[in-house]
From Swiss-Prot:
This is L-arabinose ABC transporter permease protein AraH. Part of the ABC transporter complex AraFGH involved in L-arabinose import. Responsible for the translocation of the substrate across the membrane. The gene is araH. The lineage of its organism: Bacteria, Pseudomonadati, Pseudomonadota, Alphaproteobacteria, Rhodospirillales. GO terms for cellular component: plasma membrane. Keywords: Cell inner membrane, Cell membrane, Membrane, Sugar transport, Transmembrane, Transmembrane helix, Transport. GO terms for molecular function: transmembrane transporter activity.
Amino acid sequence: MSQAMQPQRTSPSPDAAIAPARARGGVWQLINRSGIVMVFLVLFATLSLTVPDFLTPRNIQGLLLSVTLIGSIAVTMMFVLALGEVDLSVASIVAFSGVVASTLITATHSVVLGIAGGVLAGGAVGLVNGVLIARWRINSLIVTLAMMEVVRGLAFITSNGDAVMISEERFFDLGGGSFLGISYPIWSNIVGFVVFGFLLRKTVFGKNVLAVGGNGEAALLAGLPVMRIKITVFVLQGLVTGFAGVMLASRMSLGDPKTSVGLELGVISACVLGGVSLTGGVATISGVLVGVLIMGSVQDAMSLLNVPTFYQYLIRGGILLLAVLFDQYRRNQRRAMKI
């Protein structure tokens, strides 16, 4: 007649079930935001303690000056990668723009014309890249790999295979002058990071770039001008890289068609180390800045330690591989958080 009392079963609360996932997500977000900064701080502290003369004011200023070339191009490479594309032609654009600027200055003695010609030459290459990629829908890796060879060839043709010497001393002020004790190339980097950081995070254009990189088909269905956005980004990449080439020619006092070989790998490594996703849709200007400083610190330390060139290739390649692996790890974590 009496029934045995059954123990009452209680199902776990939904909030309790998702709490560990939220905790993991919070930890991952903290690592994702500050992890690369911690890596840089540990690296910088280690190099300061182990590498002679690394922390001297003169070397720090030299380090900042040495990363200006990578840094100036990384601010726009960030946009290219955020689209889910890539640009391997930047090193050739640097050489070509420097040669064009040097040739024009030597022929006309006009510094303004030379600078404008070099920058526009870079912009023209960027326009060709953008049209082929966005309008004709050719893979950006193939397009920019081909343009890397074409533009390098144009640099050799324009200079007849030799470096073009510059005699206009006014042109040297662009790369060698300073303001408030800080050289113009460093100032140009500061301006570049501020302007393009603002463009990425505070403007409709920047948000559209991230939207296109995150899901191009959805962006197209939402009415975004995907083709125009991609072409604009590649033109910006060309113009900024052209200016970087002109600045480098000013620092070297010549336009060299053989300069900056392999530069594109350093730029891409800095961006990926800084959290820019190779599949698009994710980018932060602060992360790119830290990535640039990491690349510069490693290169500076290798120079101070007189590391042989062939070992430097090995180390730079290893950094790029680690950056790609880290990017893959971040993507896996983002997928896990969405499940």
